[in-house]
Amino acid sequence: MPTRESIHYFGAGPAPLPTAVLEEASKVILNYNDSGVGIAEISHRSPEANAILANAKSGLRQLLDIPESEGPDGYEILFLHGGGSGEFSATVYHMVSVWVARQMKQLTESGVEEDKVVEKLREVLEKKMKLDYLVTGSWSLKASQEAARLVGSEHVNIVVDARKHRNGNKFGVIPAEDSWSQTQDETECALTYYCDNETVDGVEFQSTPSGHNLVADMSSNFLSRSINVRKHAAIFSGAQKNIGTTGITIAIISNKLLPPLTEMPDPKIMRKLGLPIGPIVLDWPTIAKNNSLYNTLPIFDVWIASKVMDRLLHSSSGSPRISTQEAESNKKATMLYSALDNSSGVYSVVPDKSVRSRMNICVRVKGGDADAEKAFLKGAESRGLMGLKGHRSVGGVRISNYNAVPVEAAEKLTRYLEEFAKEQQKGGANGSV
């Protein structure tokens, strides 16, 4: 029977977790802090749960240098349900509400009579409101489709569709910004949305894009490198890649988007405008007001995330605090890409070199030869290298290089990549090297 030590898992998510965290989790699930009650059993409103939540928030602020001011320069940290897909919707609900609130304020201050505000709002909405989406992979495409479903495609501006800039009409590049069709007027742009790392297509932004009211999905590269939070209106991440277990989503929201700095429009006004009103469990102001405890938060999942962050904090030695993990992520990715690039054509990396993801390395074996890829996967599994099959929508091989994948695992996989390539060059095809 395989042991945890004999298996190296490269699955795209849920992803591996640090063994030390899981070992501690196996104890607290039965008896938390010698209370005689398991952590999954304690009330989410108990002092113990509040301490776990506070520790998680504190750790995240330290790791990403998140401003804590109550003023316009500060950011709120939320723990939510619904995963990244839930936030596809939540970002639309909230950013459209913020846009409406700002338009209402502008109309009122310009002297429009109260009984005429909604009528004027409707005119402005129909003519001006745009949601900008940078479509660089499968997940940003899904997010843009959800926005179109909620508010209508006429309000969704596809700033760039990367498929149109590559042979084969497939994702794998991020065109230069001077080719983008962004909404120039900030008063018209409710949000600019991008996915920082596309797990299916192996594409990662190398720097923060420009745009008004910037919203980022960082689900698959969260806490793998330093980021400039201050450039963003909102950032969200599903926990199950780099930070914890499936069940929670973390959102970092600018105070400028929340009460009291922005008062949300009455739902009656949103209905009159024909705009969607989101479920209360996705409502950022409600979650923020209730310290992420409006409904039952899975405290065990928050505890896991806090322990992962504690490990990152204790292992860091530079500034920013995430720099140690960033260096390790880069080291593993460089090692793996080097083996792939020096395979004399046995492997072909799917995305363009300029946008290669450090987290999700998407590869074809012998140009996508089904037998060769099957042999590669079979040989990998026989060595305890698991979870390497590509996403069902694109096939191939995908190496997910998340934070908890140790350097030793990347080294073992690198050796196998080199061995398999040599065997293929000799004419072998059985993956039994």
Give the label of every model feature segment.
Residues 147, 158-222:
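Active-site phosphate-binding strand-loop segment of PLP-dependent enzymes
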Residues 239-337, 352:
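Active-site C-terminal subdomain of aminotransferase-like
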Residues 347-380:
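Conserved PLP-binding catalytic core of the aspartate aminotransferase-like
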